[in-house]
Swiss-Prot record:
PANTHER family: CHROMOSOME 1 OPEN READING FRAME 100, HYPOTHETICAL PROTEIN LOC689766. Pfam families: DUF5530. InterPro entries: SPMIP3. This is Protein SPMIP3. The gene is SPMIP3.
């Protein structure tokens, strides 16, 4: 059996003051060596400050100075990815609402050209040959070469 040390008996919870009818107030405490005995009494008049909640402190808010930037290379790769990835097919083929109220001019395929710039007559969604993916069709590859 291990010896019980005196400093291990620290009462953390507040204790109800003993009534006057109890003859033996306090608690028996054994010492470091066998045979040592002491009487422990609580001072209820002394009020201690509560212990700080170290484990439950809220971390301070940090400001992140890093802002991701969408550079030209990332934009070109994203356009290539969108051009070659096909949209997922919906789980329903057609509803009555879709059949009656769908407008065909809103359904633009990714291969259709939307606009041109006056200085460069090439369509906006076409890319230079250096950045385009290899799986593109030969029509798109040869369509904008000068003759």
């Amino acid at each position: 059996m291990t010896a019980i040390r005196l400093r291990e008996f620290i009462e953390r919870r507040p204790v109800i003051p003993p009534s006057i009818f109890i003859a033996h107030q306090g608690r028996d405490v054994q010492g470091y060596y066998p045979g040592q005995l002491a009487r422990l009494h609580f001072d209820h008049s002394a009020k201690r400050a509560p212990r700080p909640l170290i484990d439950l402190t809220i971390p301070p808010k940090t400001k992140y100075h890093y802002q991701p930037q969408l550079d030209q290379q990332t934009l070109i790769r994203y356009i290539c990815l969108r051009r070659h990835s096909k949209p997922a097919e919906p789980w329903y083929k057609e509803t009555t609402y879709r059949r009656d109220y769908s407008l065909p001019f809103y359904e633009i395929d990714w291969n259709q050209k939307l606009a041109t710039v006056s200085l460069n007559p090439r369509p906006l969604n076409s890319l230079p040959e250096l950045y385009c993916c290899e799986e593109r069709s030969s029509f798109e590859r040869n369509a904008f070469k000068l003759k």
